[in-house]
Amino acid sequence: MKFFSLADEAEFKSIIISKNKAVDVIGSKLGGQVVSFSDEWFASAENLIQPTAPIRDPTRFVHSGAWYDGWETRRHNEMEYDWVIIKMGVAAAHIIGGEIDTAFFNGNHAPFVSIEALYDEGEEGNIVEDDSRWVEIVEKFECGPSQRHLFVRGNGLTKERFTHIKLKMYPDGGIARFRLYGRVVPPELKTKDHIIDLAYVCNGAVALKYSDQHFGSVDNLLLPGRGHDMSDGWETKRSRQPGHTDWAVIQLGRESSFIEKIIVDTAHFRGNFPQFITVEGCLKESESSENTGEGTWVELVGKSKTGPDKEHVYEIRKSIRVSHVKLTIIPDGGVKRIRVWGY
């Protein structure tokens, strides 16, 4: 297993996103859910998978003691470890790496952790801690106080696909956030020409590159639903140069043969939506190709005026092979979602 310092975070992200096309498969914004846990006396296990960065308020106390934005168990655990089981928000995934963040847990942080996983075909989520199907995918490693631990599996993506994750904390303590990155296994199509959102993260889409994401992550473009406020969209900083544009390149969940329509949604962006947008597509010839959307771009949606807080629907109805799309916003601003409906 390889660990990365914060100075090497760019390399870590390159391995996760560019090389392995992985996303955080347990996060709550994708529908990840805490199924069960051994203990959460001081702070809720559900905090682990929240998309926001952890915060600290040293003046705040609750019935159990000092308030912490994370998962914290009680002292003096008589068992070997505490644990939490999380159901992925995607159908299944192959795991490559992750992050354990002990932010603000200092003197009460988790000394060691390990990660196990299993695959379950049922939908009821009735998974128990001592299920015989659990396999270790990240070996036990040491955690320090109030710091981020970035790691990648030494032997690459797991060969097996998984649906559930078990985080083990030895022997007890606190963890602020838990991210686990994997390549999504899309659900099987009912028929070959079954129309789906090819730019939906749960169908395997990944945001590969972007010009800027100052106020909101480009990954948010691919999330389910229309969100709840501006925080869960993609937003760039204000531009001051004439002719400026911002852009995002997205690898579709599968290569298209037909595109029915494209939707660009500016939900909740009312005074900061882009003035215009364009959408282009290109075809990456093979998985081994170094091309990540830098080929010949073909116009799918020409320069179009946008408005605040609405879905902009562009009828395409064209047979076209596309593996990547490029959303360009002119000159800058915020977009909530992009949908590429086709097969």
UniProtKB/Swiss-Prot annotation:
Main function: Utilization of purines as secondary nitrogen sources, when primary sources are limiting.
Give the matching Pfam families: Allantoicase (PF03561)
Pathway membership of this protein? Nitrogen metabolism; (S)-allantoin degradation; (S)-ureidoglycolate from allantoate (aminidohydrolase route): step 1/1
Q: What induces it?
A: Repressed by nitrogen.
Gene field: DAL2
Database matches in InterPro entries: Allantoicase, Allantoicase_dom, Galactose-bd-like_sf
Recorded catalytic reaction(s): these are: allantoate + H2O = (S)-ureidoglycolate + urea
Query: What molecular functions are annotated in GO for this chain?
Result: allantoicase activity
Biological-process GO terms, alphabetical: allantoin catabolic process; purine nucleobase metabolic process
Q: Which UniProt keywords apply?
A: Hydrolase, Purine metabolism
- Give the EC class as a word: hydrolase
The Enzyme Commission number assigned here is 3.5.3.4
* Entries under Gene3D superfamilies matching the protein: Galactose-binding domain-like
Recorded hits in NCBIfam families, A to Z, give: allantoicase
Protein name listed in UniProt: Allantoicase
Family (UniProt): Belongs to the allantoicase family.
